[in-house]
Amino acid sequence: MTTEAKCPFNHAVVGTGTTNRDWWPKQLRVDLLSQHSSKSNPLGQSFNYADAFKRLDLQALKRDLHALMTDSQDWWPADFGHYGPLFVRMAWHSAGTYRIGDGRGGGGRGQQRFAPLNSWPDNVSLDKARRLLWPIKQKYGQAISWADLMILTGNVALESMGLKTFGFAGGREDTWEPDQDLYWGRETKWLGGDDRYSRGSPGVDEAHGVLVKDDDSQVPHTRDLENPLAAVQMGLIYVNPEGPDGNPDPIASARDIRDTFARMAMNDEETVALIAGGHTFGKTHGAGPADNVGAEPEAGELESQGLGWHNRYGSGKGADTITSGLEVTWTTTPAQWSNDYFDHLFGFEWELSKSPAGAHQWVAKNADAIIPDAHDASRKHRPTMLTTDLALRFDPAYEAISRRFQQHPEQFADAFARAWFKLTHRDMGPRSRYLGADVPAEELVWQDPVPAVDHPLVDAQDAAALKQTILASGLSVAHLVSTAWASATTFRGSDKRGGANGARIRLAPQKDWQANQPEQLAKVLATLERIQADFNAAQSGGKKISLADLIVLAGNAAVEHAAQAAGHQVTVPFAPGRTDASQQQTDVESFAVLEPVADGFRNFAKRRYAVPAEALLIDKAQLLTLTAPELTVLVGGLRVLGANVGDSKHGVFTSRPGVLSNDFFANLLDMRTEWKATSEAKDEYEGRDRSTGELRWTGTRVDLVFGSNSILRAVAEVYASADAQEKFVHDFVAAWTKVMQLDRFDLA
């Protein structure tokens, strides 16, 4: 027997082999609810990043970053002697993965360090940017996260190149493993777009390539991008700089730009400011054919130490660098803020050309060589632009904004500074999460502001009295629970938006959402507002309760009442301090994306979707930062409390609705019931007595999944057990309280 044959680890290495998802590709991703546990965090559960950041000498750190900008390293020389443009790109590409549709992506978790982002074709050479930063990160240690450092470095880069920035806020905590919940698309090749569009690019086989015109893409002006994606091709941040699928069509490119930037919550003015401002600096890199570039970081050898895209062309760096395959420098001041970009955009006529790598780009007709070389002071080049740049000239709306910025440089500088701040802070949530001395004082509507507390808060005695008044008001347990749930569960852990604070459930657009049952909601709110007014009028010393607090307190009262009906005395924790936002503080268009298209917790779906209802339930639970046990206990409790939209009886597996019992689980797992779908769509089911055929219950996919999915069933069996009633009540109260307080960052 050979030595190789004797080795017990010839193939059987831990984690390899055929997986469950290989066997069952459509298996429900319950594992998404257990991401980023304390087991992956080397800092331990006791580490408090906010406290660590407060001890940071921010000004000293910024001085070190300023020095780094012009400290060119031989192993990766700085273009134009300044790393600023590289670091602006790093920060932009960290924040720029954010999409407003589900709030996921963005720079708030430091995910650019991990796959797939660290190996995206659009992120070529950003591995070098992070390595340039490593000595500074090493020096300041855990006082600043990678997530904060990448954004701060982009800010300092802009300042070092002459722009007055709007401000900077820290508070982004690092994660320690790749996000698994982000849907980047289903394409299996880099730069592919053939799934997100009905007819898009098939992509390339290599991790780095230049995509030229794709004749299969017939309708770039009218195509619709799949939601919630905000990038036109797999591995790009936004758009293809050559044009849609490599078609060098500025007007079609403008459509892609408008669509993708809107999905990152940017309007036309912000879009123009960001593109023009970003392209005021630096250059793109396409010194030679793309086939000179090697594997991305995740496919690299051990000796590469996490660096990728080894370039065999010339020196492989400096003047020989290849990233996008494009070779464009926009301005005569690539390391200094200026208005050159617009002067060149409108001052020249442009003709189509190709980079040394074969990518479509544009060169100024009959122009002198006025653009400096990045590494040879004796050389000059003709002005060049990307197809996406020309979109700002030939799209009528973009052109009007661009010409105004050209004529009013001060407006351009201010618009870019503000848009950059929004780009890099959009996923951080409310201002209460902002840390540091550079936080701007101005309140912005996209931050979803709420008023500060300016009055004494209610105490425990007040809360107890209010709960009695609420329960005597004639409002049902179901109405109180569903209203509190609807108010709190707009929250998204992805971008920290939504939640009960602000009581925006009484404002447009939330008051009119189908899931919120507008007619019922109006009656509940009217009653609660009367209770609020009576209480506040009776107080002395300015004590008040906000409607936001009262909505949550009312839900708590209903839960306590239902638990008492089940034989359990509980007090649901309540922390006053929420305030009521105004309609003027609420951007209707921005809040519209928070509308639930489906909420399995309330057995609601706005319509039938291609995605199974149980998968949408997992998505909702993940955005609410729930674990699998929390998801399970909440669904079971909400069903018996009657919180379904439209008073639907689906999933109400109890003969005593309004009582906080574990009946949902006991009856779902009862083998005396046989379940059958009521239609070929298999979205609703009947449960009949196996012996008599008598109808016992009706349910939906999000009900039956707790008996069907092996992981969720394992949890459901705990709560269905004969000894589980008390545990069920206490676990429900804990999970309910967590949801009610998801947006209470002031309590952390």
Curated annotation (Swiss-Prot):
User: What does the record say about PTM?
Assistant: Formation of the three residue Trp-Tyr-Met cross-link is important for the catalase, but not the peroxidase activity of the enzyme.
| SUPFAM superfamilies for this protein | Heme-dependent peroxidases
Q: How is the cofactor bound?
A: Binds 1 heme b (iron(II)-protoporphyrin IX) group per dimer.
Write down the InterPro entries for this protein, in alphabetical order. Answer: Catalase_peroxidase (IPR000763), Haem_peroxidase (IPR002016), Haem_peroxidase_sf (IPR010255), Peroxidases_AS (IPR019794), Peroxidases_heam-ligand_BS (IPR019793)
Q: Which residues form a coiled coil?
A: none
Recorded hits in Pfam families, A to Z, give: peroxidase
Listed under catalytic activity are: H2O2 + AH2 = A + 2 H2O; 2 H2O2 = O2 + 2 H2O
Q: Name one GO molecular function term.
A: metal ion binding
Check the record and name the NCBIfam families matching this protein: cat_per_HPI, PRK15061.1
Q: What is this protein called?
A: Catalase-peroxidase
Gene source species? Xanthomonas euvesicatoria pv. vesicatoria (strain 85-10)
